[in-house]
Amino acid sequence: MKKIKLLFRIGYAYHKSAFDPIIDLLLNNDKYDVWFSLDMEKIKYFIFEFPYRNQIIEDWKKLGYRFTNETKGFDIVISGDTLRNAKDYGKTLLIFLNHGTGIKNILYRNLARSPGVKYQIFVEGQHRVDSLLKCPYLGKSEVHLIGLPKLDYYFQGKFNREEVLQRWGLNPAKKTIL
């Protein structure tokens, strides 16, 4: 049986947490051939920008994550944002799974910039569903209410506060400076 070739198109490393429960589910399913791609992050020093590759990506590779720069040949592309170059991905199922909550209007602006591109848009609440259905730029895209997958671990009891504190060397007794 041919595997379904799936790409997680992650804009920035911090977006990945929005996909983690879904990534775990699909990586452990023999029906899927799972790949990842990232935008090149940059660090700014004064007015200069330099390419930056987050160290955590090496940790992901050790966990078996496979990265590619390819855009063609995927049956499904899951992204936390609309794709600037959706046509480059060819004939594929485009899934938009927001990496944050729906209080920003960037999705609406991005949909306006890509008329004719059909996304399956998965959102966190009924207000967002209603708002998108009223949006004049929705076009052929379809909207689905699913909640925020990145919170699944918390509600499934897989979130271990002590483990997180220890892993990142955090001390809850110290004041937080933003």
Protein language model annotation of sequence segments:
Residues 1-4, 158-178:
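Nucleotide-sugar donor-binding and catalytic loop/hinge architecture
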